[in-house]
Amino acid sequence: MREILHIQGGQCGNQIGAKFWEVVCDEHGIDPTGRYTGTSDLQLERVNVYYNEASCGRFVPRAVLMDLEPGTMDSVRTGPYGQIFRPDNFVFGQSGAGNNWAKGHYTEGAELIDSVLDVVRKEAENCDCLQGFQVCHSLGGGTGSGMGTLLISKIREEYPDRMMLTFSVFPSPKVSDTVVEPYNATLSVHQLVENADECMVLDNEALYDICFRTLKLTTPSFGDLNHLISATMSGVTCCLRFPGQLNSDLRKLAVNLIPFPRLHFFMVGFAPLTSRGSQQYRALTVPELTQQMWDAKNMMCAADPRHGRYLTASAMFRGKMSTKEVDEQMINVQNKNSSYFVEWIPNNVKSSVCDIPPTGLSMASTFVGNSTSIQEMFRRVSEQFTAMFRRKAFLHWYTGEGMDEMEFTEAESNMNDLVSEYQQYQDATADEEGEYEDEDQEAEDDM
């Protein structure tokens, strides 16, 4: 019941995805060959959210892996859990997208997309009651951004009533991997605004900061960053996979977090994050978790929630704890920091409690917030985009693949609209509505 189909695209998506499957296999007690070696019946009760059970009793992830070059796929295949995936579900080209969104979306990616969709259909038909799709990709490259958004829009056409959740890695403010990131990211956001239901916004710089500051790692690797992301990914869906007192699923999350359809870009966080050395001294209590979870330093994207206001937020707790205490802490947070929540959405924090904590912890929590400060991310990308687009720098790579400058202009204005919508709701107050009604009344009186 309630299956989720996982799709990973491009180098970044495949590396995050590989780490994610390590975490989920660990939680469900499944070893690298797909056999169950766990100890608790709860691990198997709803294992079918993420796994198919094959005839020989092996568990096979409902995962589709795609890329336009074979490199990353090969390393996933030779990695610790490489043998667990269905071999047919690796779909890859040979040419690569060369960090070019147009190649991923219109030329190279478009040639490969049908074989990816075949695999997606096959997996979807295996599902009893498909809840939705989760897509891992980055927005800075070519495949994850270009082909990723192409796949999302195709799936949207075919399964319009299923949830579409993305874990999107945005270009970082200070660290740039490629020059054309702002182009690729803007073109992708243009697609995500229209076709995705929920986007979890991540970026490497914020993740590096968490590794430096909180985890005290001197030289964090991408593996460390991806581990943080996968902890959050597993937290978002833990309620579907394990019994809980207050359940949430992808659709409940969306209903509670999205006040206006276009504003579905969320900040995510995870607690407890402790450095390896100091773990044993740390008392895990609900107040501790809550405090760290709402901490600005804990957000996995480079936007500071203190610069905006929360429209809505959701806290997912895992472990044995009293629901009363969870509710008290949530109310407490809202009362103490009331200026950081919009007052025209009362009770805008949803909490859920799942009984089974992640491996190695007694309790944990995942935070998902819809904050207007996320506009900082878009604004930054937009400034970089404009600087290059004004000079038409690097455009020939895109027009050469058949794109039109008009598309760039559209994407740019769509992103700027998004920024101003966030700004508008950040400034809105509860009593404005009343003023408009008075004006309407006066207008009628004049008539």
Curated annotation (Swiss-Prot):
Mg(2+) binds at residue 69. GTP binds at residues 11, 69, 138, 142-144, 204, 226. InterPro entries: Beta-tubulin_BS, Beta_tubulin, Tub_FtsZ_C, Tubulin, Tubulin/FtsZ-like_C, Tubulin/FtsZ_2-layer-sand-dom, Tubulin/FtsZ_GTPase_sf, Tubulin_C. Its cofactor is Mg(2+). One of its GO terms (biological process) is microtubule-based process. Pfam families: Tubulin, Tubulin_C. GO terms for cellular component: cytoplasm; microtubule. Residues 419-447 are annotated as: Disordered. GO terms for molecular function: GTP binding; GTPase activity; metal ion binding; structural constituent of cytoskeleton. Residues 429-447 have a biased composition (Acidic residues). The keyword Cytoplasm applies. It is found in: Cytoplasm, Cytoskeleton. Keywords: Cytoplasm, Cytoskeleton, GTP-binding, Magnesium, Metal-binding, Microtubule, Nucleotide-binding. Its main location: cytoplasm. Dimer of alpha and beta chains. A typical microtubule is a hollow water-filled tube with an outer diameter of 25 nm and an inner diameter of 15 nM. Alpha-beta heterodimers associate head-to-tail to form protofilaments running lengthwise along the microtubule wall with the beta-tubulin subunit facing the microtubule plus end conferring a structural polarity. Microtubules usually have 13 protofilaments but different protofilament numbers can be found in some organisms and specialized cells. Belongs to the tubulin family. Tubulin is the major constituent of microtubules, a cylinder consisting of laterally associated linear protofilaments composed of alpha- and beta-tubulin heterodimers. Microtubules grow by the addition of GTP-tubulin dimers to the microtubule end, where a stabilizing cap forms. Below the cap, tubulin dimers are in GDP-bound state, owing to GTPase activity of alpha-tubulin. This is Tubulin beta chain. It comes from Hordeum vulgare (Barley). The gene is TUBB.
